[in-house]
């Protein structure tokens, strides 16, 4: 059975997305990836609309079996937390309208699944994602969000594989 899993690293300026393809015998490869870049000059409402429309287009083109996001975490600035939460809501809605199941993992859980430690740096995540999937492009400094999205997708692939085996 093959499966497509989409990881999304949400943001109000940049949202990275990454789709992995899982083949029989648990072979993982990169399917596609990208970043939705939004202008800080646009209103938040306009950015949320663009985020929704762009991700909806990707979901319509690819139709993944699952969408994976980071769990909400609290920033020092409450307004940042609220704005990010709204971006997450837009992304969840885009998947829900297409009946695509949504899963969430804490950032440290995704990092542990890819790097082996939950407090890994962004650069360590990028390095391991590039090695696991053999895509050196994610080592670029402007690809941190994409690497995080890949980490979330890989984390879900590992977790769902163990769940299917009855391991919790």
Swiss-Prot record:
Subcellular location: Cytoplasm
Entry-linked InterPro entries: RNaseH-like_sf (IPR012337), RNaseH_sf (IPR036397), X-over_junc_endoDNase_Mg_BS (IPR020563), X-over_junc_endoDNase_RuvC (IPR002176)
Cofactor(s) in the UniProt record: Mg(2+)
Database matches in SUPFAM superfamilies: Ribonuclease H-like
GO cellular component, one term: cytoplasm
S-S pairs: none
Biological processes per GO annotation: DNA recombination; DNA repair
Entry binding sites for Mg(2+) 2: 70
GO MF annotation terms: crossover junction DNA endonuclease activity; DNA binding; magnesium ion binding
EC nos: 3.1.21.10
Cofactor note: Binds 2 Mg(2+) ion per subunit.
Catalyzed chemical reaction(s): Endonucleolytic cleavage at a junction such as a reciprocal single-stranded crossover between two homologous DNA duplexes (Holliday junction)
Residue ranges of coiled coil: none
Keywords from the UniProt entry: Cytoplasm, DNA damage, DNA recombination, DNA repair, DNA-binding, Endonuclease, Hydrolase, Magnesium, Metal-binding, Nuclease
HAMAP family: RuvC
Family to which this protein belongs: Belongs to the RuvC family.
Quaternary data: Homodimer which binds Holliday junction (HJ) DNA. The HJ becomes 2-fold symmetrical on binding to RuvC with unstacked arms; it has a different conformation from HJ DNA in complex with RuvA. In the full resolvosome a probable DNA-RuvA(4)-RuvB(12)-RuvC(2) complex forms which resolves the HJ.
Protein name (Swiss-Prot/TrEMBL): Crossover junction endodeoxyribonuclease RuvC
Organism from which the protein derives: Chlamydia caviae (strain ATCC VR-813 / DSM 19441 / 03DC25 / GPIC) (Chlamydophila caviae)
Gene transcribed to yield this protein: ruvC
């Amino acid at each position: 059975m093959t499966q497509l899993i989409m990881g999304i690293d949400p943001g109000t300026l940049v949202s990275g997305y990454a789709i992995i393809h899982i083949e029989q015998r648990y072979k993982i490869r990169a399917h596609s990836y990208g970043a939705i870049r939004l202008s800080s000059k646009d209103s938040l409402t306009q950015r949320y609309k663009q985020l929704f429309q762009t991700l909806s287009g990707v979901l319509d083109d690819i139709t993944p079996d699952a969408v994976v996001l980071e769990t909400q975490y609290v920033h020092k600035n409450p307004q940042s937390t609220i704005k990010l939460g709204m971006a997450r809501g837009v992304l969840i809605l885009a998947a829900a309208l297409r009946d695509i199941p949504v899963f969430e993992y804490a950032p440290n859980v995704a990092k542990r699944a890819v790097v082996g430690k939950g407090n890994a740096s962004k650069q360590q995540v990028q390095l391991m994602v590039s090695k696991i999937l053999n895509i050196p492009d994610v080592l670029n400094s402007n690809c941190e969000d994409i690497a995080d999205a890949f980490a979330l997708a890989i984390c879900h692939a590992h977790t769902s594989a163990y769940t299917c085996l009855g391991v919790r």
